[in-house]
Amino acid sequence: MFQGASALTLDAKGRMSIPSRYRDALQTQAEGRVTITKHPDGCLLLFPRPEWEIFRDKVDKLPMNATWWKRIFLGNAMDVEMDGAGRVLVSPELRTAGGLEKEVTLLGMGRHFELWDAQTYAAKEQAAMAEGMPDALKDFTF
């Protein structure tokens, strides 16, 4: 399970260094292989390959009226491998789709990650906190 936020930097080639606390898990779980695709909220999703295959199969079974979502998730997916330095390459197309420049935030979201432009994530997080908790969390106990 992946959790926590990491402030990272994309290098000039679009490579991102995976935080060391996740590298061993990604090597063990996925042999360093990950899949990156678009997320409807304007960030990118980064899956260890076995988790991607589960997600991909769910998306593939969506009904015909969700064909555009299949295109968004599956048609934009790119398989990448961590290099010897623990970096993954985020393609130019996906960097553009996620609005990623240089400063990024990698969020561990359980079985996958979200990759955000750092400023965009900070603004969206601040807006969500200003709105207060949604009804779904009203009975949630901390």
From Swiss-Prot:
Domain of life: Bacteria
InterPro entries: MraZ, MraZ_C, MraZ_dom, MraZ_N, MraZ_sf, SpoVT-AbrB_dom, SpoVT-AbrB_sf
SpoVT-AbrB domain segment(s): 5-51, 77-120
Biological-process GO terms, alphabetical: negative regulation of DNA-templated transcription initiation
Subcellular location: Cytoplasm, Nucleoid
Protein keywords: Cytoplasm, DNA-binding, Repeat, Transcription, Transcription regulation
CDD domains, sorted: MraZ_C, MraZ_N
Stretches that traverse the bilayer: none
GO molecular function ontology, one term from the record: transcription cis-regulatory region binding
Predominant localisation class: cytoplasm
A cellular component term, taken from the record's GO annotations: nucleoid
Signal peptide limits: none
Coiled coil, from the record: none
NCBIfam families: division/cell wall cluster transcriptional repressor MraZ (TIGR00242)
Family membership: Belongs to the MraZ family.
Complexes and interactors: Forms oligomers.
Identification of the protein by name: Transcriptional regulator MraZ
Organism encoding this protein: Paraburkholderia phytofirmans (strain DSM 17436 / LMG 22146 / PsJN)
Gene: mraZ
